[in-house]
Amino acid sequence: MHRADCIFCQIAQGHSPCHPIWEDERHLAFLSIFPNTKGFSVVITREHHGSYAFAADETVLAGLVLAAQKTAKVLDRAFDDVGRTGLILEGFGVDHLHAKLFPMHGTAGLASGQWQPINSGGRKYFEKYEGYISSYDCERASDVELAALAAHIRRFA
């Protein structure tokens, strides 16, 4: 299925331009036209699926993740200073299932197995989603609060 009002469907069908970097029969990866780092890419399903990854059929989601993995390896090889590529499945921007890939420039040493921690020093705690995802650690949470939150979440498992 394709939706005429979906820009990713238009791109997948070849009706809108993109700068492709990898593709197979079910997926297409292309450079973002709004990059916040060199090589920032988007991997989409060729068929239209809603953007919330965890509402997708397991086979569809697994296919997208494997396509993202293949694309990430291409990005890792394409940049001398990249040893890892980050993945986000936030589902905003376009209501079409997609993964965002971020080559992590400055991580080349990690590719050879020389793991090292990289800490941003960020300390902002988010009460609500602000349009972007941050992966830095914040202040240490109390074990009492964490235990209560874990108990609450387990009730829905």
Question: Where would I find each of the regions flagged by the language model?
Answer:
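HIT superfamily nucleotide-processing domains
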Residues: 1-157
